[in-house]
């Protein structure tokens, strides 16, 4: 969602407490892996975003890189990845017609090397946008060409590599109206249709997603996202999925029923759903109480994805707390992921395990039916 900067200093919990060895830890499935459990539950993947090589810029963490890379690329925890920043407009086209795919290519290459799905992110977004786009007074004709040229170059460069593209990111206000981005001010909702239409032409095999935050419970904003799905479907323009970013708060998280209702609201429109940027921040320093709330929140949102057939996968927005964007945008909050600074696991890790393994205890028929629908 946002560009993470340098290392934040988080008070470190005692190892046993941080690893979730207190009350309610549950069985350690570290030898199994979240992606393995997710696939047994009928999901397509459980993944983590990464800012490789951006992570290398975090001074003082050099000794952490080998273990980070082992978990990210060489363990059974993750079956997919997303470049956190490397495919965004600011980085790939900083000047008009001048493209730099270096960071995105590193992640794409590693995903290919280690047999992981690649979710690509994000073609058109108002934030982390190159200044030349935002600061120019465009005519409609000129801005259409800018959008088409950008998507053609970027999606074309990664053609055949991306399981899915977040084509348009965060186009909505909280009340469900359109955000007044440079794209909307000049073109109105036409820019959304143009972006999806162009992406479909350039990479016809990629799943095309609308992606946004605060879509994880029924609200005016979820209704706005449904309007976007209907807009594209009515125009016969491909849209295959809606991404629920799921940047949540441990102390005030939605219920399981809220999540299920929101996900079903989209799948009933004939699109798949994925949790695309999952993290659940809490007030720091972490306590036993808010870590328990975080565990419950992770269990609810992952459990909802497992329980609704059209929800195909989960991506956490990195997995290692020191690499999270959260502390730089929310003062006094952090520890939003599943691994602490010492690489011990949050109690929330075991909440995710519980959400995934509860599904595996259901009938083989329900899992087979789900897999058949995913392959359809």
Curated annotation (Swiss-Prot):
Its EC number is 3.2.1.8. Optimum pH is 6.0. It comes from the Eukaryota. Residues 1-18 form the signal peptide. Pathway: Glycan degradation; xylan degradation. The active site is at 170 (proton donor), 277 (nucleophile). Induction: Expression is inhibited by the transcription factor CreA in the presence of glucose. It is found in: Secreted. This is Endo-1,4-beta-xylanase A. The lineage of its organism: Eukaryota, Fungi, Dikarya, Ascomycota, Pezizomycotina.
């Amino acid at each position: 969602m946002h560009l993470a900067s340098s290392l934040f200093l988080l008070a470190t919990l005692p190892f046993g407490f941080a690893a979730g060895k207190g009350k309610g830890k549950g069985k350690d499935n570290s030898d199994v892996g979240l992606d393995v459990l997710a696939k047994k539950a009928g999901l397509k993947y459980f993944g983590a975003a990464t800012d490789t090589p951006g992570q290398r810029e975090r001074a003082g963490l050099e000794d952490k890189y080998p273990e980070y890379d082992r978990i990210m690329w060489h363990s059974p925890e993750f079956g997919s990845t997303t470049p956190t920043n490397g495919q965004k407009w600011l980085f790939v086209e900083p000047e008009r017609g001048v493209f730099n795919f270096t960071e995105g290519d590193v992640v794409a290459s590693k995903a290919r090397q280690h047999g992981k799905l690649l979710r690509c992110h994000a073609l058109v977004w108002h934030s982390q946008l190159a200044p030349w786009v935002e600061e120019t007074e465009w005519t409609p004709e000129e801005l259409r060409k800018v959008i088409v040229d950008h998507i053609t170059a970027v999606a074309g460069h990664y053609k055949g590599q991306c399981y899915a593209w977040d084509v348009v990111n965060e186009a909505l206000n909280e009340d469900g109206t359109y955000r007044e981005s440079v794209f909307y001010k000049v073109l109105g909702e036409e820019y959304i249709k143009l972006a999806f239409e162009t992406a479909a032409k350039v990479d016809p095999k990629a799943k095309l997603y609308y992606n946004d935050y605060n879509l994880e419970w029924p609200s005016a904003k979820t209704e706005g996202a449904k309007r976007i799905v209907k807009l594209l479907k009515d125009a016969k323009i491909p849209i295959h999925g809606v991404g629920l970013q799921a940047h949540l708060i441990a102390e005030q998280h939605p219920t399981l029923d809220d999540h299920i209702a929101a996900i079903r609201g989209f799948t009933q429109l004939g699109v798949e759903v994925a949790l695309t940027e999952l993290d659940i921040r809490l007030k720091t320093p972490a306590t036993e109480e808010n870590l328990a709330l975080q565990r419950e929140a992770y269990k609810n949102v992952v459990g909802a994805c497992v329980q609704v057939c059209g929800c195909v996968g989960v991506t956490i927005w990195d997995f290692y707390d020191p690499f999270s964007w959260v502390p730089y945008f929310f003062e006094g909050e952090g520890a939003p992921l599943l691994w602490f600074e010492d690489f011990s696991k949050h109690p929330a890790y075991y909440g995710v395990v519980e959400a995934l393994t509860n599904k595996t205890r259901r009938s083989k028929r329900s899992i087979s039916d789900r897999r058949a629908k995913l392959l359809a």
